[in-house]
UniProtKB/Swiss-Prot annotation:
This is Homoserine O-succinyltransferase. Its main location: cytoplasm. Its EC number is 2.3.1.46. InterPro entries: Class_I_gatase-like (IPR029062), HST_MetA (IPR005697), MetA_family (IPR033752). GO terms for cellular component: cytoplasm. The keyword Transferase applies. The keyword Amino-acid biosynthesis applies. GO terms for biological process: L-methionine biosynthetic process from homoserine via O-succinyl-L-homoserine and cystathionine. SUPFAM superfamilies: Class I glutamine amidotransferase-like. One of its GO terms (molecular function) is homoserine O-acetyltransferase activity. Belongs to the MetA family.
C-alpha cells in the first residue's frame, strides 16, 4: 500500500526514483475505496484446485476482493462435479453486461492444439474482446497469455519439441514499473507448457514491453503499454506439488515426460520438490491487484472512462 506524504515533500522525488509507491495528500484525499471486483475464467481441468490456488494469492493482499467464477461453457467437466459448476460458476451471458476491476484467465491443457482448432476458441475471443471495454486490467496466465497475444496482436507461439516443465531463473529487464516493485534482480518461477513466444518479436512490438525473462524459459512477464493487459507465461499460482502431480500423471498415462528442471531435490522424483517461487508469485499478484487494478480502476464501475492511467502518475 502507498505511503501518503505532503504534496511537495522533497523525499517524494527520491522515493519515486527508487520505485517506491508514494501518494500525494491531494490524491489520497480524493481517493474512494471499495472492494475490488475480480472475475476468474477458469479453463483448467481441475477447477477446485486452480480456483483455490488463485484465491490463496488474492487473499494474501490487504485489499478486499469480491470474486466471481466464470466458465467457458455449460458442458460437463470431466474433473469437477456438475453441482460444483452450477453452484459456483457463472455463464458469460450472466456477466457480459457488467464491468469488473480485474479479470484472470487461467492456463489450459491445450499447448499442442492450434488456436483455431480449440472447441471454444470463438468464446475465448469474445471474452477477450469484451474485457478490453469492461475490465480495468486483465491477467492472462500461460496458455491464455499465448492465446491473447495471438488474438490481440497477431503474435503466434512456436511449439517446443519437449514440454518445458520446471522452475527457472528470471531477470528483470525493466526497473521502474510498478509491477516489479519489491522484486529481486533475479527470481524463480515455475513453467509447464508445450510452446513459447519469440522474445525478440515481443520486444519489437510497439504495444508491448517485456518486463522479465529467462535464458532458459524465455519471456515471463509482458505488459501492454496501456497497462491494461498483463501476460504471464508461467504459473505463479502453482503449489509445491503441482509440477510433481503433472509429471506422475503423464507417466501414468504412458508418456515419457522429462523430469521437471530445478524442482526435485537432487533431481530425484523420489524426493520432495522444493518450492522457491512462493514469495515472488505472491508479490506478482499483489502488485498487479494493487497498482494495475486498485490504483487505476474507477470508483464507479459503470463509467470505465474513469480509469486513471499510470502515465499521469509517474
Amino acid at each position: 500500500m502507498p505511503v501518503k506524504i505532503p504534496d511537495d515533500l522533497p523525499a517524494a522525488e527520491i522515493l519515486e526514483s527508487e520505485n517506491i509507491f508514494v501518494m500525494s495528500e491531494t490524491r489520497a484525499a480524493n481517493q474512494d475505496i471499495r472492494p475490488m471486483k475480480v472475475l476468474i475464467l477458469n479453463l483448467m481441468p481441475n477447477k477446485i484446485e486452480t480456483e483455490t490456488q488463485l484465491l490463496r494469492l488474492l487473499g494474501n493482499t490487504p485489499l478486499q476482493v469480491d470474486v466471481d467464477l466464470l466458465r467457458i461453457h455449460d458442458k460437463e467437466s470431466r474433473h469437477t462435479s456438475i453441482d460444483h459448476m452450477n453452484n459456483f460458476y457463472r455463464d458469460f451471458e450472466a456477466v457480459r453486461h457488467k464491468n469488473y476491476d480485474g479479470l484472470i484467465i487461467t492456463g489450459a491443457p491445450l499447448g499442442q492444439v492450434e488456436f483455431e482448432d480449440v472447441s471454444y476458441w470463438d468464446h475465448i475471443r469474445e471474452i477477450i474482446d469484451w474485457s478490453q471495454q469492461h475490465v480495468t486490467s486483465v491477467l492472462f496466465l500461460c496458455w491464455a497469455a499465448h492465446a491473447a497475444l495471438f488474438h490481440l496482436y497477431g503474435l503466434n507461439r512456436k511449439l517446443l519439441k519437449e514440454k518445458r516443465s520446471g522452475v527457472f531463473l528470471h531477470k528483470r529487464t525493466h526497473r521502474h514499473v510498478p509491477l516489479l516493485r519489491g522484486f529481486d534482480d533475479e527470481f524463480l518461477a515455475p513453467h509447464s507448457r508445450f510452446a513459447e513466444m519469440d522474445v525478440q518479436l515481443l520486444k519489437a512490438h510497439p504495444a508491448l514491453q517485456v518486463l522479465t525473462e529467462s535464458d532458459e524459459a524465455g519471456a515471463y512477464m509482458v505488459l501492454s503499454t496501456n497497462n491494461r493487459n498483463l501476460f504471464v507465461m508461467g504459473h505463479p499460482e502453482y503449489q509445491k506439488s503441482t509440477l510433481k502431480d503433472e509429471y506422475f500423471r503423464d507417466l501414468g498415462a504412458g508418456l515419457q515426460p522429462e523430469i521437471p528442471q530445478n524442482y526435485f531435490r537432487h533431481n530425484d522424483p523420489g524426493q520432495d520438490p522444493v518450492a522457491r517461487w512462493y514469495g515472488h508469485g505472491s508479490l506478482l499478484i499483489s502488485n498487479w491487484l494493487n497498482y494495475y487494478v486498485y490504483q487505476l480502476t474507477p470508483y464507479n464501475l459503470d463509467d470505465m472512462s474513469g480509469i486513471t492511467p499510470w502515465e499521469n502518475e509517474v
